A protein has these predicted regions:
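Repeat-solenoid scaffold signature
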Residues: 1, 108-119, 125
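Rossmann-like dinucleotide-binding cores of NAD(P)H-dependent redox enzymes
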Residues: 72-112, 188-231
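Short, hydrophobic/aromatic-rich segments at coil-to-beta transitions
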Residues: 238-241
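Flavin-dependent oxidoreductase catalytic cores
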Residues: 1-52, 57, 62-68, 169
């Protein structure tokens, strides 16, 4: 039974929504705050063939929901592993619930009869071949990697790929990007005893964190991370990151490893194809 429990992510969405909108919401339980609206899942009047493109949390949940409604569901994931962006959370111990959510949704989908095809990319030709009655596109996003000189150097790791490259992270690290992902990555590396420098071009950090989570996050940043706010990255070198602050002064942040956490961009090109 333990494996059938959708566990709390400790994401603070429930408390943040209460403060912001006077409602209750939950990242993993869509019934929270909607208890009077009736059952979430209703049997479909007609069974259809549904093709889901993408094996991240969104695709898995959509496939599971469609299967519970009685549809024939095929889920395709182009990688050899399910999880989407949540695969990267396995690198950070205090984010393990995020990674476990993928495992839970995958188990539910399989138990509901969803056919999962790994290493299978959905293309227009593939859709034509399968001829589904409905196509759900849940291909997620890709890391935003601006054309900064040196950003493709051997000492640079994209934050989404950290879980596969932890042995490459040296003792002195610069994290580019002070959003939620960059901040959490920096805290984790700081907890491991590394010297971590966080570079953010805005004056504030983690502006994408919710109102309850952010204050706690900033306290951990103070404990473990050297912050360089208001600094724009101009170049990545073998010695670290060259930046410029808002007054025009040049700053060199020394680092052996550079983590790129400059955001995500929706894969709209896949949708439009």
């Amino acid at each position: 039974r333990d494996k059938d429990i959708v566990r709390c992510l400790r994401c603070f969405t429930c408390m943040a929504e209460r403060a912001a909108t006077s409602t209750r919401r939950c990242t993993v339980n869509p019934l929270i705050g909607r208890e009077l609206e009736g059952d979430e899942i209703q049997p479909a009047p007609v069974k259809k063939k549904v093709l889901v493109a993408g094996g991240g949390p969104g695709g898995l949940y959509a496939a599971w929901t469609a299967a519970r409604r009685g549809h024939q569901v095929i889920l395709c994931e182009k990688e050899e592993e399910l999880g989407g962006i949540l695969k990267s959370e396995i690198a950070i111990p205090f984010k393990k619930e995020m990674y476990q959510l993928t495992e839970t949704y995958a188990r539910f989908a399989r138990q509901s009869g969803v056919e999962i095809r790994l290493g299978c990319e959905v293309t227009p030709e593939y859709v034509e071949k399968e001829a589904p009655d409905a196509l759900i596109i849940a291909v997620g996003s890709r890391p935003l990697v601006p054309p900064i000189p040196g950003i493709k150097g051997e000492n640079v790791i994209i934050v989404n790929e950290l879980y596969k490259n932890q042995d490459r992270v040296a003792d002195k690290v610069a994290v580019m990007g002070g959003g939620l992902a960059g901040c959490e990555c920096a805290i984790h590396l700081g907890m491991e005893g590394k010297e971590v420098h966080l570079i953010e071009m805005r004056d504030e950090l983690a502006v994408d964190a919710n109102v309850r989570h952010r204050p706690l996050l900033l306290k951990e940043i103070e404990k473990y991370v050297h912050v360089h706010a208001g600094c724009r990255v101009e170049e990545v070198t073998a010695d670290g990151v060259r930046c410029r602050d808002k007054d025009g002064n040049e700053l060199m942040v020394g680092a052996q490893t550079v983590i790129c956490a400059l955001g995500q961009r929706g894969r709209t090109d896949v949708v439009e194809a």
